[in-house]
Amino acid sequence: TSSMDIKERCPYVYADTECLYDNSLDDCLIRLHNDECDGVITQADILRLYKYNHMKDYIYDYIPTSIYVPETGEAMSAVLTSTDADIIDMVSRVSDENAVKCINIESDTIQRLNVRGYMQMTRAMASIEDDVLRVDACIYNHDKSLHRSNSGDVNSPKTVITNLVSDIISKI
């Protein structure tokens, strides 16, 4: 895990859990890969940085802020695991709806952009505030990059994504 606060709160979230604090998510992922631990708890922002580049073989889900709020008021945390689906199943049942929506929207945006076939790398980040959905996407193609964003009603994610993808496609 990447936060001492998480280590201190971990036993309250999961009964009979022993936590080991580590400053490096890379080291935690190595331990997880080598079956030295059952899961990794980290900040959601850190998870997002690793999501597209380093975590191809891991399952993850978010812990809702209603049961796990660091004193610093930072973003909700996430649990990663490579083998123990029980951890993810448990977290999924209580997961924050907006976090799950954002993950699905990000994945859909990336998939729609990558289907074009000429992007080297595509990244997307969705956020929901009140009733507004904002999706940012950045594509990289050889020596060029393009960043665009689109906002709209949280109840119309397909429209927001379609408009964003159309905008990007028209610019490349």
Task: List each model region and its residues.
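Small-molecule-sensing regulatory modules
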Residues: 7-16, 20-172
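Early extracytoplasmic/lumenal segment of secretory-pathway proteins
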Residues: 4
